[in-house]
């Protein structure tokens, strides 16, 4: 299962978190779940259009009642900000026009782009578009990630590799990439290279090490507590007693008294006769 599923979704709530934070209201038009999801997709498409050189790793979205906060994680913040903030103002204006709310735009710099799977995949795709040999591009990216401190990396390319008539898939791996281990901190990225032979998909998995018990405890403490049966005061599993744990004395008197009452009735009838 871990070999096929998206590593971010597989570890959601364990080592990864949601990239969109908001609450939907099904009773209000424009605030339903489908409306917010559609709006998130349009925001991310707006960020990716014309911003290929900015090296955007991810976009986080958080909504409040009258404001939308957009955090852009980029390897080149200067391109996103623009000269004297002109590009940032343009992006903020388009986002406010799209959402109809006040937008707070935060531009965050990615300190180590060689360790970001999305940026690594985008870099390989750009080299494939420039007619660089796919094996050379893959191995160069893997060496850069390992020099940056990655404990393992896996790169896969699918499509008409090298202009071949028949499409195929090839992947290379260095180090450990434990996709089944939930505590493993694995970053995943995907990007498509638009070549003259067609599109080539690039997938990258980067293993950054296991999440320690201390980090998991900090994440659990930061997460809001949810009302579950196991969290109720008293015995584990709530105050409701199991069927096997109920005392037998509650059901025994009814079983004993019923035959006695049935036996007393014929005796009374015989005395009257």
From Swiss-Prot:
One of its GO terms (molecular function) is mRNA binding. Pfam families: KH_2 (PF07650), Ribosomal_S3_C (PF00189). InterPro entries: KH_dom, KH_dom-like_a/b, KH_dom_type_2, KH_sf_prok-type, Ribosomal_S3_C_sf, Ribosomal_uS3_bac-typ, Ribosomal_uS3_C, Ribosomal_uS3_CS. GO terms for cellular component: cytosolic small ribosomal subunit. Residues 218-273 are annotated as: Disordered. Residues 218-227, 249-273 have a biased composition (Low complexity). It comes from the Bacteria. Belongs to the universal ribosomal protein uS3 family. Binds the lower part of the 30S subunit head. Binds mRNA in the 70S ribosome, positioning it for translation. PANTHER family: 30S/40S RIBOSOMAL PROTEIN S3, SMALL RIBOSOMAL SUBUNIT PROTEIN US3C. NCBIfam families: rpsC_bact. Part of the 30S ribosomal subunit. Forms a tight complex with proteins S10 and S14. This is Small ribosomal subunit protein uS3. The lineage of its organism: Bacteria, Bacillati, Actinomycetota, Actinomycetes, Micrococcales. The gene is rpsC.
